[in-house]
Amino acid sequence: MRPMSRLPPFFAADGDRFVPSASARGPWSARHQHGGPPAALLARAFARHVGAEAQIARLTFDFLRPVPLAPLTIATRVVRAGAKVQRLAGTVLAEDGAAVIEATCLVMRVTPDRVAVPLDTLAPPAPPAESAPFELPFMSGDEGYHRAVEWRLAKGTWGRGPVAAWLRLRVPLVAGETPTPPLECLVAVADSASGVAVAVDPARATFVNGDLTIALHRAPAGEWVCLDAATTGEAHGIGLARARLWDTTGLVGRSLQTLLLEPRAGG
């Protein structure tokens, strides 16, 4: 049974605004949000444009500036409405009206049993029940994103190369909306791949991602998401975090983050 959390939901809806709680706080500043929850708000808004015979196949988020731990508004629009492919765009706006995240969404029509495809032969990660609970060492405190998410290590050793970890939200994305839909759960945690499989020592360097791309070949199911992640970086300061995305029924898609690697002051 899923453990109950006393932490508040990531957001409370207030008219057309979404007011964040401490659960949305990220790792780099107490004044800023983790990128996952506000990105999931955009996914939530995009999903409302998607009909029963279509699926979100790709989401790309550009993080334009740190997302403040303050009320946000979401704006979406249809860029192209096609019979087979639909393109959407969206923006997360801060209280001052500045865009903090811009996103695009590719929606594709789905037709059951339309084509025959070979089964994926990748070995799945150990299931959540067989994976050990763990915490990210570089995130501390009694409140924050790291507490609002449950973490289980399925493969590898944190800080030593590729790692597979199961994540699930302990709190709703939006207050009063339970259960959180699987797509929103996936987007809320996919931004954590670079923290699951770190390329640098977080005590000595930061690894802020400027973007997040999620490509899905099928719709996710359930609340658990596995990030089978690996990160590479260069001494000149650019890194890439990539992950296979799984749910408990199989492979769902892939994610990619572009990282800015910078030494900490005195690091």
What role is predicted for each listed range?
Residues 1-267:
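Terminal targeting signals and extreme-terminal segments of soluble enzymes
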